[in-house]
């Protein structure tokens, strides 16, 4: 198996979440682990401390960022050939199927590869993802906004999306800061 850890968050209770992606049967899938403060896997989270989330149809998921919502739910985001992707988990590691479609919220910018590398949670519960969209060797900074339910917020940008490219430059969004 091929596994990649790409992000870490410490929960208020001291438990450590590590997100990333693994090679699964139909491509890459989101992987989430939770460790107790002594470094052992949390047996009360997922299956023995590990959650692997794979969606049918070959939707490749490479997690890059993670955030904790005020209610304890966990957002793991990244993307791939199908666009930006975010999966929301309950505090026990089960997928929150009320988010997006069966727990998965997506936003495609182009026919190419789109990846979210930044995440921010707004006070009103909305979720902002930033990263890049690569199509025909033109890379653009890409930003989208979802509602707290995992639906693209059509009031943001053009149809919930914003893209910006610097002519003659490879433009990739790597982080997101809110203030």
Question: Model regions: which residues?
Answer:
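A sequence-level/structural motif corresponding to short, flexible coil/turn segments enriched
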Residues: 1-179
């Amino acid at each position: 198996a091929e596994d990649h850890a790409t992000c870490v968050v410490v929960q208020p209770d001291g438990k450590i979440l590590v997100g990333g992606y693994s090679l699964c049967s139909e491509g890459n899938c989101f992987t989430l682990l939770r460790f107790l403060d002594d470094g052992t896997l949390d047996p009360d989270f997922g299956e023995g401390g590990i959650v692997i989330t794979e969606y049918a149809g070959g939707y490749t998921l490479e997690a890059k960022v993670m955030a904790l919502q005020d209610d304890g739910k966990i957002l793991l985001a990244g993307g791939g050939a199908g666009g930006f992707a975010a999966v929301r988990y309950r505090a026990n590691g089960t997928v929150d199927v009320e988010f997006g479609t069966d727990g998965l919220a997506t936003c495609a910018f182009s026919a190419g590869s789109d990846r979210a590398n930044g995440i921010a949670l707004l006070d009103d519960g909305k979720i902002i993802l930033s990263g890049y969209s690569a199509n025909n060797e033109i890379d653009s900074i890409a930003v989208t906004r979802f509602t707290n339910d995992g639906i693209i917020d059509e009031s943001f940008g053009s149809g919930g999306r914003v893209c910006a490219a610097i002519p003659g430059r490879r433009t990739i969004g790597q982080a997101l800061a809110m203030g």
